[in-house]
């Protein structure tokens, strides 16, 4: 029942117990109270008996006291949605945090929604071109699909997601939503200013902006970090249903959603499961991921960065995420140590749509040939390490030389990394990517030095770089 009144009976960090006189609020209902003159939202997590509910706070609880009055809103957390959110930054409960006044939305939605029915879902497979060679060739993304960027600490997940925002969101005519889940506030701030510079956000005319931002960063309590992905998803769902177009939904980082869920679970006293994660890990992930889908009215293409703890892909958090994805881009520390960026592992990354029926026979064959050469090189590395290159057959020496060129040719300068590399970013059309790698595999460029293939765009740049290298050597 809405407007039922209760009183705070216990505060333990982010967990607040509230006692009601008669009607208990339902699980997931939002409760409002006041703390230090500001509104504090609590979400009901458990019914304890004796008319008491256990709740998780969506903001800091310092200063909250026993006996404080709490009001039941009668429903889940609701946030403003629609065009009024474009160009704005909101927190988990839909409050603006960009100091630009209130969000004047005509519509609001609850952040907990059921996934679309099977009959409403649509299945289509069309490639989403990113302009990044290694992705477009070996693990292409599908429109309306779910894409995961997996990697340990510091291998370039955020740089890659920023480049994808740069390449796709800027040329994408529809709307984008970015959810910053438990990541660095500095990165969130940088992204906002980058979007203003690139005209994706227009501060002078916010209604013409193409992106809405939702942040629940590292410094937030676990309740906020566990729900902010759902807040972003609710915005994306509304854009999909309203505009009927392809909406881009970026999440950085989905692991923090799981991590916050595990913190909340421990605070609620649940017995942990494997590696200390919450017993409801698969359910929490499934409920969220099933909402990110394409319906007959429109589609959501989601790109999610997934932190891999201690570089262990079998950790329950990344392993549970794998099951929901259409394409996985795995970033490897071994490749980043070679100085090859983006540090995408060409053999570990995969895509459901790398299929001749979808991408075409030529693309499929070139991708498989490239992977075949790289796989052969990988299997020869032990022999090279022990006996040296001289012990290899002539055919194997040629394979190794081509593999090293391919490995370097899969690198590419990024626009967003210009400050590190000093060179302008390059986007490569998919036709050029396929024809270039087809020629390299066929041996047409065996005469060029492998250094010419490093950090360039198309094959024309390789030839030009090789000529410059030859001129410098002369």
UniProtKB/Swiss-Prot annotation:
Lipid bilayer topology: Peripheral membrane protein
This protein's UniProt keywords: ATP synthesis, ATP-binding, Cell inner membrane, Cell membrane, CF(1), Hydrogen ion transport, Ion transport, Membrane, Nucleotide-binding, Translocase, Transport
EC class: translocase
Superkingdom of this protein's organism: Bacteria
EC number(s) per entry: 7.1.2.2
Claim: Nucleotide-binding is one of the keywords in the record: yes
Catalytic reaction list: ATP + H2O + 4 H(+)(in) = ADP + phosphate + 5 H(+)(out)
A single GO cellular-component term on record: plasma membrane
Signal peptide: none
Localization per Swiss-Prot or TrEMBL: Cell inner membrane
PANTHER family: ATP SYNTHASE, ATP SYNTHASE SUBUNIT BETA, MITOCHONDRIAL
Family stated for the protein in its record: Belongs to the ATPase alpha/beta chains family.
Biological function: Produces ATP from ADP in the presence of a proton gradient across the membrane. The catalytic sites are hosted primarily by the beta subunits.
Name of this protein: ATP synthase subunit beta 2
């Amino acid at each position: 029942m809405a407007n039922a009144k209760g009183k705070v009976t216990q505060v333990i960090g982010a967990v607040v117990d509230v006692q009601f006189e008669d009607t208990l609020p339902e699980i997931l209902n939002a409760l409002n109270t006041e703390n230090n003159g500001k509104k504090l939202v609590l979400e009901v997590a458990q019914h304890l008996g004796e008319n008491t509910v256990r709740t998780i706070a969506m903001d800091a609880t310092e200063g909250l006291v026993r006996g404080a009055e709490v009001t039941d809103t009668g429903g889940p957390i609701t946030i403003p949605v629609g065009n009024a959110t474009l160009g704005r930054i909101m927190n988990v409960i839909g409050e603006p945090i960009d100091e630009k006044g209130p969000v004047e939305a005509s519509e609001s939605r609850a952040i907990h929604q059921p996934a679309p029915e099977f009959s409403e879902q649509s299945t289509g497979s069309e490639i989403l071109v990113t302009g990044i060679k290694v992705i477009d060739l070996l693990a292409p993304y599908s429109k309306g699909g779910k894409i995961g960027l997996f990697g340990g600490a510091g291998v370039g997940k955020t740089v890659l997601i920023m480049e994808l925002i740069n390449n796709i969101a800027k040329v994408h005519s529809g709307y984008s939503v970015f959810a910053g889940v438990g990541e660095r506030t500095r990165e969130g701030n940088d992204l906002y200013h980058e979007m203003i510079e690139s005209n994706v956000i227009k501060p002078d005319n916010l209604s013409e902006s193409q992106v809405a931002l939702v942040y629940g960063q590292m410094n937030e309590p676990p309740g906020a970090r566990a729900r902010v992905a759902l807040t972003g998803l609710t915005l994306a769902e509304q854009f999909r249903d309203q505009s009927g177009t392809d909406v881009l939904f970026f999440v950085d980082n989905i692991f923090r959603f799981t991590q916050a869920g595990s913190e909340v679970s421990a605070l609620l006293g649940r017995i942990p499961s494997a590696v200390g994660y919450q017993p409801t890990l698969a359910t929490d992930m499934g409920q969220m991921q099933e909402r990110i889908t394409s319906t007959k009215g429109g589609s959501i293409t989601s790109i999610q960065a997934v932190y891999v703890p201690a570089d262990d892909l079998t950790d329950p958090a990344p392993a549970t995420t794998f099951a929901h994805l259409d394409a996985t881009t795995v970033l490897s520390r071994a490749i980043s140590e070679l100085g090859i960026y983006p540090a995408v592992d060409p053999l570990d990354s995969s895509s459901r749509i790398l299929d001749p029926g979808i991408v075409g026979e030529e693309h499929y064959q070139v991708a498989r040939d490239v992977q075949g050469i790289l796989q052969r090189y990988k299997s020869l590395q032990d022999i090279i390490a022990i006996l040296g290159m001289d012990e290899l057959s002539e055919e194997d020496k040629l394979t190794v030389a081509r593999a090293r060129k391919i490995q370097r040719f899969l690198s590419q300068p990024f626009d967003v990394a210009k400050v590190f590399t000093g060179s302008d970013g390059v986007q490569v059309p998919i036709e050029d990517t396929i024809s270039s790698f087809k020629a390299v595999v066929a041996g047409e460029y065996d005469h060029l030095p492998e250094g010419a293939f490093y950090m360039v765009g198309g094959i024309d740049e390789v030839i030009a770089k090789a000529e410059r290298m030859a001129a410098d050597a002369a």
